[in-house]
């Protein structure tokens, strides 16, 4: 695990003419769910394109600990699932490392079973609140033991028979919605989730693909009601995981802000609940061509061609936040090179990510000469076209707080700043995008990692 290892700073320097074609690693959301649903479904599931970052592998290990058989042959992961309702009690605590998604979804999946399951994680995950997932599980009859503030370690024990509930999700959170639906898989009757604002819908699409009896209705106000019939049969599937739009964001923004760049990114997931960043960048004047649109496994996929663009500041509509919550750090970097002011509101979710992502972004921008204001749930960035004066002539490292997206965002910033940008640690990039350094330097980006000092 990289989180226990020595931090390894990295520095990005002004680059030009980033060029090439790349394939982004598989989508993290779909990869987590592929392991989970494949491990739960009866029969064999085959997965290609899986994101093999630490977070997803930890989800796979958790499914193995509960009875799924998982092996890799060539580029294909093959899972023999246990069958819905047939998970086994894990003999040891389930360690999710840094993976909030894997941890919260698995709590829903296994929490309603009539046995004890214990969840642990790394220092970053142990600080993150789990109450939003634990509250609906309590309503279903699950007994919860947790550290103060509903934090890890958490031990769950389901009732003899869980109660199906109707749960209105109090905030825009795909993780909470998904956890309740997954708990509903082993609950008799109909479990209903009411979602006031649509969030990423991979759980619904994929559960339907695996054979769950799940329906979605959307009313005139956009409120979605999702109903799942519990204890039905799930059957193994063949899945080709499309490229992760959140990882795509880094080479995409690099191509926009580095002069002379022309990059093509293949096989990108274009699910409408995930494309807020692309839409926002296009509104800022980004030259992004969407090519070869197609469907893969019920999901929209396309190739993107991105070229260097003169960006202009915009006000991002607040209701777009759920569709790009993970992309605000790298959007803030793009805004630092745009003409004028970019205003981002509705960012309260960023306070409870791997780090307090909002203050981490604002602090990193200020350190590197960007004029910005951090509000309670907002960020205002006043850009400097061409990156004049941005970066650091000497010393000064961006504090990443063990957060992979902060690290990658600021390394992208350094590629177009007048002076270099250094992050205090790049080891945790492996949690979501292990190939980041290799792909970026392959395009011509000047990024160097510090040598590992002997411990």
From Swiss-Prot:
Gene Ontology MF terms in the entry: 3-phosphoshikimate 1-carboxyvinyltransferase activity
Subcellular localization: Cytoplasm
Chain coiled-coil ranges: none
The reaction(s) this protein catalyses: 3-phosphoshikimate + phosphoenolpyruvate = 5-O-(1-carboxyvinyl)-3-phosphoshikimate + phosphate
Keyword tags: Amino-acid biosynthesis, Aromatic amino acid biosynthesis, Cytoplasm, Transferase
EC number from the UniProt entry: 2.5.1.19
Family: Belongs to the EPSP synthase family.
Cross-referenced SUPFAM superfamilies: EPT/RTPC-like
Entry annotation: catalytic residues: 326
Annotated GO CC locations: cytoplasm
Quaternary structure and interacting proteins, as annotated: Monomer.
Alphabetized InterPro entries for the sequence: Enolpyruvate_Tfrase_dom (IPR001986), Enolpyruvate_Tfrase_sf (IPR036968), EPSP_synthase (IPR006264), EPSP_synthase_CS (IPR023193), RNA3'P_cycl/enolpyr_Trfase_a/b (IPR013792)
Pathway connected to this protein: Metabolic intermediate biosynthesis; chorismate biosynthesis; chorismate from D-erythrose 4-phosphate and phosphoenolpyruvate: step 6/7
Record function comment: Catalyzes the transfer of the enolpyruvyl moiety of phosphoenolpyruvate (PEP) to the 5-hydroxyl of shikimate-3-phosphate (S3P) to produce enolpyruvyl shikimate-3-phosphate and inorganic phosphate.
Residues the record lists as binding phosphoenolpyruvate: 28, 100, 128, 175, 357, 405
GO BP: amino acid biosynthetic process; aromatic amino acid family biosynthetic process; chorismate biosynthetic process
Sequence positions that bind 3-phosphoshikimate: 28-29, 33, 173, 175, 326, 353
Record gene name: aroA
Stretch list, region Disordered: 1-23
UniProt xrefs under NCBIfam families: aroA
Organism name: Rhizobium meliloti (strain 1021) (Ensifer meliloti)
Gene3D superfamilies per record: Enolpyruvate transferase domain
Protein name: 3-phosphoshikimate 1-carboxyvinyltransferase
């Amino acid at each position: 695990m990289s989180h226990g290892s020595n931090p390894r700073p990295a520095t990005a320097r002004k680059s030009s003419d980033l060029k090439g074609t790349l394939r982004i690693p598989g989508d993290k959301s779909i990869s987590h769910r592929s392991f989970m649903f494949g491990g739960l479904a009866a029969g064999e599931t085959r997965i290609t394109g899986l994101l093999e970052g630490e977070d997803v592998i930890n989800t796979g290990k958790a499914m193995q600990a509960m009875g799924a058989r998982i092996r890799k042959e060539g580029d294909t992961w093959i899972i023999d699932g246990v069958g819905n309702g047939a998970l086994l009690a894990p003999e040891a605590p389930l360690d999710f490392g840094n993976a909030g998604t894997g941890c919260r979804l698995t709590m829903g999946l296994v929490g309603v079973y009539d046995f004890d399951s214990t969840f642990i994680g790394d220092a970053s995950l142990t600080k993150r609140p789990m109450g939003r997932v634990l509250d609906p599980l309590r309503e279903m009859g699950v007994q919860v033991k947790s550290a103060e503030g509903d934090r890890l370690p958490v031990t769950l024990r389901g009732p003899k028979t869980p109660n199906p509930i109707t749960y209105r999700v109090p905030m825009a959170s795909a993780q909470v919605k998904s956890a309740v639906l997954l708990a509903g898989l082993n609950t008799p009757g109909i479990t209903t989730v009411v979602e006031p604002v649509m969030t990423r819908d991979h759980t619904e699409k994929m559960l339907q693909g695996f054979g769950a009896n799940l329906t979605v209705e959307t009313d005139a106000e956009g409120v979605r009601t999702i109903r799942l019939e519990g204890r039905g049969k799930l059957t193994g599937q063949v899945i080709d995981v499309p490229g992760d739009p959140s990882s795509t964001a880094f080479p995409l923004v690099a191509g926009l802000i580095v002069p002379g760049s022309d990059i093509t990114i293949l096989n990108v997931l274009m699910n409408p609940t995930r494309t807020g960043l692309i839409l926002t960048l296009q509104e800022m004047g980004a030259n992004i061509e969407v090519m070869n649109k197609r469907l893969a496994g019920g999901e929209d996929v396309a190739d993107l061609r991105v070229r260097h663009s003169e960006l202009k500041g915009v006000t991002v509509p607040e209701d777009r936040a759920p569709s790009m919550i993970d992309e605000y750090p790298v959007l803030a970097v793009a805004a630092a090179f745009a003409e004028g002011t970019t205003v981002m509101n509705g960012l309260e979710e960023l306070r409870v990510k791997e780090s307090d992502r909002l203050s981490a972004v604002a602090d990193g921008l200020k350190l590197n000469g960007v004029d910005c204001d951090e509000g309670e749930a907002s960020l205002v960035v006043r850009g400097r076209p061409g990156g004049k004066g941005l970066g650091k002539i000497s010393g000064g490292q961006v504090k990443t707080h063990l957060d992979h997206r902060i690290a990658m965002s600021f390394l992208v910033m350094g590629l177009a700043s007048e002076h270099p940008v250094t992050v205090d640690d790049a080891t945790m990039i492996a949690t979501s995008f292990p190939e980041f350094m290799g792909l970026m330097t392959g395009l011509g980006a000047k990024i160097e990692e510090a040598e590992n000092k002997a411990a």
